[in-house]
Amino acid sequence: MNSVNNIRSTFLDYFHRNGHQVLSSSPLVPRNDPTLMFTNAGMVQFKNVFTGLEQHLYKKATTAQKCVRAGGKHNDLDNVGYTARHHTFFEMLGNFSFGDYFKEEAIFLSWDLLTKEFCLPKDKLLVTVYQSDDVAAELWRKISGLPDEKIVRIATADNFWAMGDTGPCGPCSEIFYDHGDEIWGGPPGSMEEDGDRFIEIWNLVFMQYEQLSKEERVDLPHPSIDTGMGLERIAAVLQGVHDNYDIDLFRVLIGASEKITGIKATGDFVASHRVIADHLRSSAFLIADGVLPSNEGRGYVLRRIMRRAMRHAHLLGAKEPLMWQLLPALICEMGQAYPELVRAESLISETLKLEEIRFRKTLERGLGLLNEESAKLKEGDHLNGEVAFKLYDTYGFPLDLTQDVLRRRGISVDVDAFDKAMERQKEEARAHWSGSGEAVTETIWFSVRDQVGVTEFLGYETEKAEGIITALVCDGKIVDEVSSGQKAILVLNQTPFYGESGGQIGDSGIISGEDFIFEVHDTQKKADGVFIHLGKVKSGHAKISDCVQLTVDVVRRKKIRANHSATHLLHEALRQVLGSHVTQKGSLVSPERLRFDFSHPKSVSLEELKKIEDLANEIVLQNNKVTTRLMAVDEAISEGAMALFGEKYEDEVRVVSMGAPLEQGGLKKHWSIELCGGTHVERTGDIGLIHIVSESSVSAGVRRIEALTGAAARLYLCRQDVRIREISDLLKTSSSDLEERVRSLLDERRKFEKELNDVRKKMVLNGKITESGQGDITIINGLSFMRHIVKNILPRDLKALVDAGKKQIGSGVVAFITISEDGKGSAVVGVTDDLTDKLNAVDLVRILSNVLGGQGGGGRSDMAQAGGPDGNKANEAFAALKDFLEKT
């Protein structure tokens, strides 16, 4: 009855029975709100409703909102795993009234749910109200029957909520649960309020004022209600535990990590299991909502979360990537409530696994440096910020990960020195950046907009138009006139020229007046609506207020239209072949080709690429009309239109639909529906043909395809056909047998390479092709030291050579370095069995690696390998090893 899933359902069902519209959780990446890193409260999706910018058909709503607090102002990351109630990911249950009911009904509903639906004892509950909120205090007495001592008045900002310096605001009323006097802590407002005895389980916000300025506050005409209850907190209360990590959901996740690692969640290992369970939730949900690990913004916060969990997996002794193995347990627990987890399972799994594999490569080395530096310190000391920065810059250790490692040792980090090192790096990067060469700063366009207004775009309906010059910019300054030969920027009251945005590049063409001709090389969109036309005056003089003719390069525009429409078809085809986790991560639409970046954890196979291409071309061959509609953004998304997470959209958006309508869930839905402000073909057949020419990696979890359309695609395929015929003739075979012929030649080549390599190995051991420039075997203090520098030997064959060398000398040290064609050096060192108690091959190979410019090395005491980029320093490396042996 009291499982997390049942509690969530009970809450939503209760408010649905009481006239509330049940709405889905909004994404963790807030839509249309650049001020927030992540959705961190239930009211975020209703922010514009509360401020009056939007209106909904319903007046009452209820949600179970997924939230993340791990970046910026709301950052719980450092405390997660070490306290009973801190999480990076949590669920916020809420009920909302938009000018419908107010304090009395909000208080009644909350008390009714807690005491009748959840059956909490009344004597275990107490509430707080804002000090001057007599109405709320009296309503609590009337509805709950609580005595005055259990209705606590609080004067601090904790009981007064505001959206910002201005905007809706109002007093709060918080509901607390008393865990009993066996747990330390006092009621809210007391000296002991930070204890764990009294836990806030629900916050009711009475939005009744509008803050106009610091000094002025007025009543709202339609007061509203915003409430929030942490699901994990109420679950702990209803399940009779005092710690959120003891509820059923976390017991399942922690049990899964215990089973895989073989380490019980006891003693020093409790925090690690908790960190992994919590961070798995935030990582999985962020990836499902389109965030991928990167080195900036939201992606960097995700990477910090993931790497913190991976470091704790390392503490548990996990030898293989762990988090992806826990994903099935998470989906089993939360997949029904949040189907996006199921849809994105493969993307989440692969992203977790790849990130952990990458980080493991540097984790050991970074921890080695950290242990070495911290060994010089004692409890209470500070780690040098420069060392912390090196860990960040070289080994990928976020600052909070370094702080987390040092926490148990009682050592902190000199954060000021770290910040200075970070700023120094940024300044150096800025100094090396040459800039774009543009003289005009962005601020000038806001000045232009304030003076002449925005530009009306006519390009959806026409490629020719008349207009009036409203502003001229030359050499970074606003001017009244430009003359023949000058590079300039023209702004007009209206234009058919498309300004670069949404991945589609800007139009080019001609602007002409009675006394001038201006070549437009590019068009850009600035300052939320000012279209700027960049180019050169070919003849005459252009002046402010001149009437002009604007003519877009139609041939170029036609190619751009085809490539943009093809991008939409490829996006949908990618989703159908690879899965619904595919989302757009970037694009470039030019006349020559299109480029599309998308979320996917691994390379796309040739077979998958063919399916994607065939699907897109099927829609091209349908030759159906491409439709565009203007509609409300919420309506468009409810009809299935794809929107980009984090993209800011106006209240009214342009929806582009392509492909014959299909029956889906009783509704007819076009094959592709996207929110898009770009220019498109009139019919899908106008695209002509789509051909994917390449697929590659952009970054972790992001792939890229490039494609051609129309005549460019046909020309490319014709050239490919000619090339295949020429290669077939060269290999004296037919085009149909070309693949088999190439495979045969590759097999022959591999056979000859093996034979040649075997001969080379024999010659090396016989001393016929060494290039060490010194004696191959030297006696050092009675120890035989054999070394060889060889070329054209594969690194994997060095071990066999070293083994043979050990047999040849009987007792001693053998070292080989091979130099590849690109100049890199690979080294292997062997120590005969009789000397491994005195000499370790790993220590010896690291001497070679340091000189070769590498980092460390690995292996066993009798055989180890390493490498480095400076193969030309092989002789120096051997000299360093010889010097070490002479001193040993």
Curated annotation (Swiss-Prot):
Name assigned to this protein: Alanine--tRNA ligase
UniProt cofactor note: Binds 1 zinc ion per subunit.
Superkingdom of origin organism: Bacteria
Subcellular location, record wording: Cytoplasm
NCBIfam families registered for this protein in UniProt: alaS
The entry's keywords: Aminoacyl-tRNA synthetase, ATP-binding, Cytoplasm, Ligase, Metal-binding, Nucleotide-binding, Protein biosynthesis, RNA-binding, tRNA-binding, Zinc
Any one annotated GO CC term: cytosol
Chain residues that bind Zn(2+): H564, H568, C676, H680
InterPro entries from the UniProt entry: aa-tRNA-synth_II/BPL/LPL (IPR045864), Ala-tRNA-lgiase_IIc (IPR002318), Ala-tRNA-ligase_IIc_anticod-bd (IPR018162), Ala-tRNA-synth_IIc_core (IPR018165), Ala-tRNA-synth_IIc_N (IPR018164), Ala-tRNA_ligase (IPR050058), Ala_tRNA_ligase_euk/bac (IPR023033), DHHA1_dom (IPR003156)
Domains: entry comment: Consists of three domains; the N-terminal catalytic domain, the editing domain and the C-terminal C-Ala domain. The editing domain removes incorrectly charged amino acids, while the C-Ala domain, along with tRNA(Ala), serves as a bridge to cooperatively bring together the editing and aminoacylation centers thus stimulating deacylation of misacylated tRNAs.
Family assignment from sequence similarity: Belongs to the class-II aminoacyl-tRNA synthetase family.
Family matches, as HAMAP family: Ala_tRNA_synth_B
Gene Ontology biological-process entries: alanyl-tRNA aminoacylation; negative regulation of DNA-templated transcription
EC number of the protein: 6.1.1.7
Role noted for this protein: Catalyzes the attachment of alanine to tRNA(Ala) in a two-step reaction: alanine is first activated by ATP to form Ala-AMP and then transferred to the acceptor end of tRNA(Ala). Also edits incorrectly charged Ser-tRNA(Ala) and Gly-tRNA(Ala) via its editing domain.
Annotated catalysed reactions: tRNA(Ala) + L-alanine + ATP = L-alanyl-tRNA(Ala) + AMP + diphosphate
Annotated organism of origin: Bartonella tribocorum (strain CIP 105476 / IBS 506)
Molecular function via GO: alanine-tRNA ligase activity; aminoacyl-tRNA deacylase activity; ATP binding; tRNA binding; zinc ion binding
Required cofactor(s): Zn(2+)
